[in-house]
């Protein structure tokens, strides 16, 4: 899980979603998981 100021899609499987006001990236590749903070 990366904590980044700006979250970006790293591949075509990445999806940017919003959970409880937190922007997150979910992906089939666990290395691509990110959250904004």
UniProtKB/Swiss-Prot annotation:
<dbReference type="GO" id="GO:0005737">
    <property type="term" value="C:cytoplasm"/>
</dbReference>
<keyword id="KW-0687">Ribonucleoprotein</keyword>
<dbReference type="GO" id="GO:1990904">
    <property type="term" value="C:ribonucleoprotein complex"/>
</dbReference>
<dbReference type="Pfam" id="PF00444">
    <property type="entry name" value="Ribosomal_L36"/>
</dbReference>
<dbReference type="InterPro" id="IPR035977">
    <property type="entry name" value="Ribosomal_bL36_sp"/>
</dbReference>
<keyword id="KW-0689">Ribosomal protein</keyword>
<comment type="similarity">
    <text>Belongs to the bacterial ribosomal protein bL36 family.</text>
</comment>
<dbReference type="GO" id="GO:0005840">
    <property type="term" value="C:ribosome"/>
</dbReference>
<dbReference type="InterPro" id="IPR000473">
    <property type="entry name" value="Ribosomal_bL36"/>
</dbReference>
<dbReference type="GO" id="GO:0003735">
    <property type="term" value="F:structural constituent of ribosome"/>
</dbReference>
<dbReference type="GO" id="GO:0006412">
    <property type="term" value="P:translation"/>
</dbReference>
<protein>
    <recommendedName>
        <fullName>Large ribosomal subunit protein bL36</fullName>
    </recommendedName>
</protein>
């Amino acid at each position: 899980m990366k904590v980044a100021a700006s979250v970006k899609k790293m591949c075509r499987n990445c999806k940017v979603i919003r959970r409880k006001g937190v922007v997150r990236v979910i992906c089939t590749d666990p290395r691509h998981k990110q959250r904004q903070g």
